[in-house]
Amino acid sequence: ISALIAHAEVSGRLHLSHADGEKPIDIHFKGVAGVAGVTTGTAFVRQPPANLRRVKDARTDQPEHELDEFQAALGEVKAELRQISDSLAEHLARKETALFDTYLRMLEDHTLSGEVCQRIRSGETAPTALKYVVLDLVARFEAMDDAYLKERATDLMDLGRRILAKLLHEQSEHFEYPNDVILVAEDVTPVMLGEVDTQSLKAIVSIKGSANSHVAILARSLGIPAVMGAVDLPLGEISGAHVIVDGWRGEVIVEPSEHVLAEYQRAIDDAAILELDLEQIEPGAAMTADGTHVQLMLNAGPFGELSERQRSWIDGVGLYRTEFIFLARSRFPTEDEQESEYRTELATYAPMPVVMRTLDIGGDKSLPYFSIAEENPFLGWRGIRVTLDHPEIFLTQIRAMLRADSGLGNLRILLPMITTLDELRASKALIERVVLELTAEGHQVSAPEVGVMIEVPSAVYIAPELAREADFLSVGSNDLTQYLLAVDRTNARVADMFDGFHPAILRALQAISQAGKKAEIPVALCGEMAGDPLAAVLLVGLGFNELSMSSGALASVKRALGTFSSAECRFLAEQALQSESGQHVRRRVAQAFLEKQLNLLVPPNLRETLQVEMA
């Protein structure tokens, strides 16, 4: 209720100011940081093309006509997607525009088009059938716990709305965008983004969504800031307003004052200087100031390609999520289909190691063709529990991975959601069985290294035992932080409480690192912490020797690590472990960055505060 009151007050303030002919000043709206960066521009509010939820149920006695209408609408949407993909091709790598190929496959998939056609044949009109099929799929994805998979609901809803608009024969609108567009919508989608000239697009702001959404990934590739989950932003009142988008803080400021605008302009100028500075970073592996090698690994997904310079910085792939292969189909992929996908990934980075996480589904992360309903899916049947209960799924995937690795030898297998030693032992036994089977069949395969993903509190406490039987440990810092602090990081109301610098998180990380060191096995971390320069220095001090991150974070992390010695990293980590709050830890590390003249790697708000205190 308090949130609704606050929203109404802000909307009223904007409305009254507009009615009086006066501009409101410095109205702040909080969201979630989607893509770091700061910019200013003109808000352009984009409405969805049609509303599926408003479609009234109707039946038809001419199903063939409705089928023809549906197929025609489908064809028009496909043509638009191809056109948008072509327009973005000159600004994005092929792997990034490939998401539009994914959309096309979604439109052709039996789960969507097949079910719509089936309902039409049963007597429903095309709009009615489309409504029920799309809303059902959207509900399934929205129920998933995994942030990336949850975001696929937005993609499905957008495709459904576009098909509906064609079915209703609504004319495609031609929008006149300003030359400094801040694209704002309840759910900004990649297709909406693709409709705007990339030279004019300055930032995106979405009421829904998170940093894992496709549109945030595209914004990151285009180098534009994004704020997601700005739930209190009154869409009906801000179109045409001058706004600041702060992708560092996850904040939108409507009609900023001259004073605030001047402050942010300094941040914009600093960001440009930092970009030029990072472009000067030399090729080669990441090293601390005293020459200690820190392995920078890549979080690989369906999007993003590395430049030759970036490729020289990495030591391999720290996390490849195999869910993508399963989500792109209306059935379980065959062993041969999986082998082909895995082979491409392994060969791309060979001879560097590629860590492939086995299928992580179950509970709230069900596939459209493998639905699982539970009262408490967050703590239910998921991860390794599902694949051990369904060994046919696990065995097929392991067979595909090992066949793909034949002749390359750079495969590492990562097991998700391990909570007991028995789960690790059972998984390893199945992997050993596959090695023997494939060898007997004449395949040239070798036993891969098998690691455990530490992402739940129980795994932290049994890390020493897990480390004795695993070949490596890999911390999923996003989920571990969420579980330890009981904070949903995609919820804008509590997003500020999601803090990887919290002493409890750092002490858990230290325990994991020490367990790996005692067992003499590598310990990696994949998650947002690894890509944060301030956190990366702490992680090295805590003993982590592998940091896995998105390609966009490689340069800033390499720059930071090259300025601190191993001893300095350890000293900062020791201080952090004795701190009482995450805020205190962050301030202390940021202060060390300022002392090293790494000012531009410190978030602007924190940098300004510390510079005033140090003056």
Language model region names:
Residues 1-348, 354-361, 386, 390, ...:
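Non-catalytic, soluble scaffold/interaction modules
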Residues 273-615:
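Conserved alpha/beta-domain cores
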